[in-house]
Amino acid sequence: MCLLIDAGNSRIKWALADTARHFVTSGAFEHASDAPDWSTLPVPRGAWISNVAGDAAAARIDALIEARWPALPRTVVRASAAQCGVTNGYAEPARLGSDRWAGLIGAHAAFADEHLLIATFGTATTLEALRADGHFAGGLIAPGWALMMRSLGMHTAQLPTVSIDAATNLLDELAENDAHAPFAIDTPHALSAGCLQAQAGLIERAWRDLEKAWQAPVRLVLSGGAADAIVRALTVPHTRHDTLVLTGLALIAHSA
């Protein structure tokens, strides 16, 4: 049994896995929220941790583990040149984020023998190009949908700051009034829809460019907390998989 922890910038996801492909239980919590209830969980043989949220998150994770399972072995996952069938095409492999690395491993296992474009939607939107043979060819990083909207609100004099929940409601209203209207007629709707279309445009352009470059079909795989909203703006085929990082961590743990 392995404890898997994926600490992102917005929240911490975790799972207990008894094999490389099966989660016994899982959950998620915000960085500032109450601790998860691990009191009934069996003792794992160790914890495998991907943390891109910094030192404060690392200290909290250590404290949570120590409170429930003192002295439990912990492995902080870092990207390497090759692991679990994936080779790292980064110029400096160790500089690739651990979440992106684990996600690549999870995606390669889930969609074996397929070329992939993996789009993950969190605080940042990341795109990873993964060949069918497991070679990570490179990626793109852009502000996430929420960060785009928040940045416009913070760094302009007259634009509002719109949250994801508010933007989703605004887009629902826009769709109900005219599902085919390409442009909004007020600022909050325009900001919400514009930032959403920017996300969709990035993804669709990258997907088309990758299929052209590789001269082969590429599966577009979507993951992350903001995927529900962004899916509505996409016009290309796609597949959802919301546990890529945890799946990759499970594979890393069971290969140790």
Curated annotation (Swiss-Prot):
Keywords: ATP-binding, Coenzyme A biosynthesis, Cytoplasm, Kinase, Nucleotide-binding, Potassium, Transferase. Its main location: cytoplasm. Its EC number is 2.7.1.33. A monovalent cation. Ammonium or potassium. It catalyses: (R)-pantothenate + ATP = (R)-4'-phosphopantothenate + ADP + H(+). CDD domains: ASKHA_NBD_PanK-III. The keyword Nucleotide-binding applies. GO terms for biological process: coenzyme A biosynthetic process. Disulfide bonds: none annotated. It comes from the Bacteria. Its cofactor is NH4(+); K(+). GO terms for cellular component: cytoplasm. ATP binds at D6, A7, G8, N9, S10, R11, I12, K13, T123. Signal peptide: none annotated. Pathway: Cofactor biosynthesis; coenzyme A biosynthesis; CoA from (R)-pantothenate: step 1/5. Gene3D superfamilies: 3.30.420.40. The active site is at D99. It is found in: Cytoplasm. Substrate binds at Y90, G97, S98, D99, R100, T187. GO terms for molecular function: ATP binding; pantothenate kinase activity. PANTHER family: TYPE III PANTOTHENATE KINASE. NCBIfam families: baf (TIGR00671), PRK13328.1-1 (NF009865), PRK13328.1-4 (NF009868). Catalyzes the phosphorylation of pantothenate (Pan), the first step in CoA biosynthesis. This is Type III pantothenate kinase.
